[in-house]
């Protein structure tokens, strides 16, 4: 009878140990400013359950960093992402932009009623070489500060724009001067010419009349 009870407890879901429910690497390492990946395996029974990645001890009160939504969709939060492969019964955790402070105890876990199946993973972070850190800093500074070449190109472009605008200004002034000549000075000249013609015309008529009068009244020889 006790053997039947033991077998029943073994096959009941949730009664197996954490190592039997979810497994993974006991230790992983990554380099500062790099990334690392952890693959946690689980039995087919937990296919439709939420999986998570948490940090800290004790394990029952660890801080959950990221958790799936019972699907195979990628879930990302800050620098940590998780994806569940329900065909191969593996969920993959990726940590990016690693920092020295990321080193510590983590857990692969499955959310269920009662104690969650969990597996302990020790994460180690190796310090990045100084040359790599200097290269990263130089790249950031280069992206922030404008290069002298670009600045020179901008100045040459502005100078060309100013030079090209001067002929347009001269052409506009010439057009305005021509219009003033046509609409102001030309009518003035025509008016002066008309006045001169009007003044000189009566004088000619008056002179011609006097000559005729002299001829008419001159004595006959």
From Swiss-Prot:
Residues 165-170, 177-186 are annotated as: Important for maintaining surface expression and for interaction with FCER1G. Disulfide bonds join 40-108. GO terms for cellular component: plasma membrane. Gene3D superfamilies: Immunoglobulins. Residues 1-18 form the signal peptide. It comes from the Eukaryota. It is found in: Cell membrane. Residues 199-221 are cytoplasmic. It is a single-pass type I membrane protein. O-glycosylated. Acts as an activating receptor in myeloid cells and mast cells. (Microbial infection) Acts as a functional murine norovirus (MNV) receptor. Primary determinant of MNV species tropism and is sufficient to render cells permissive to infection by MNV. Can render nonmurine mammalian cells susceptible to MNV infection. This is CMRF35-like molecule 5. Residues 38-48 are annotated as: May play an important role in murine norovirus (MNV) binding. Belongs to the CD300 family. It comes from Mus musculus (Mouse). GO terms for biological process: immune system process; regulation of interleukin-6 production; regulation of tumor necrosis factor production. PANTHER family: CMRF35-LIKE MOLECULE 1, POLYMERIC-IMMUNOGLOBULIN RECEPTOR. It holds the Pfam family V-set. GO terms for molecular function: virus receptor activity. Interacts with FCER1G. SUPFAM superfamilies: Immunoglobulin.
């Amino acid at each position: 009878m006790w053997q039947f009870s033991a077998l029943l407890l073994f096959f009941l879901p949730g009664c197996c140990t954490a190592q039997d429910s979810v497994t993974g690497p006991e230790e992983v390492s990554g380099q500062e400013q790099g990334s690392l990946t952890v693959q946690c395996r689980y039995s087919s029974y937990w296919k439709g359950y939420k999986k998570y990645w948490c940090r800290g001890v004790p394990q029952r009160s660890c801080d959950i960093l990221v958790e799936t939504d019972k699907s195979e969709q990628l879930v990302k939060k800050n620098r940590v992402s998780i994806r569940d492969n329900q065909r191969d019964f593996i969920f993959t955790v990726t940590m990016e932009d690693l920092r020295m402070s990321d080193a510590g105890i983590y857990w692969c876990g499955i959310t269920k009623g009662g104690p969650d199946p969990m597996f302990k993973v020790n994460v180690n972070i190796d310090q990045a070489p100084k040359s790599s850190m200097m290269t990263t800093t130089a790249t950031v500074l280069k992206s922030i500060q404008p290069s002298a070449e670009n600045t020179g190109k901008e100045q040459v472009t502005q100078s060309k724009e100013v030079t090209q605008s001067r002929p347009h200004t001269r052409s506009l002034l010439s057009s305005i001067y021509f219009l003033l000549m046509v609409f102001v000075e030309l009518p003035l000249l025509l008016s002066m010419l008309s006045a001169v013609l009007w003044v000189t015309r009566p004088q000619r008529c008056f002179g011609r009349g006097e000559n005729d009068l002299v001829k008419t009244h001159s004595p006959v020889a």
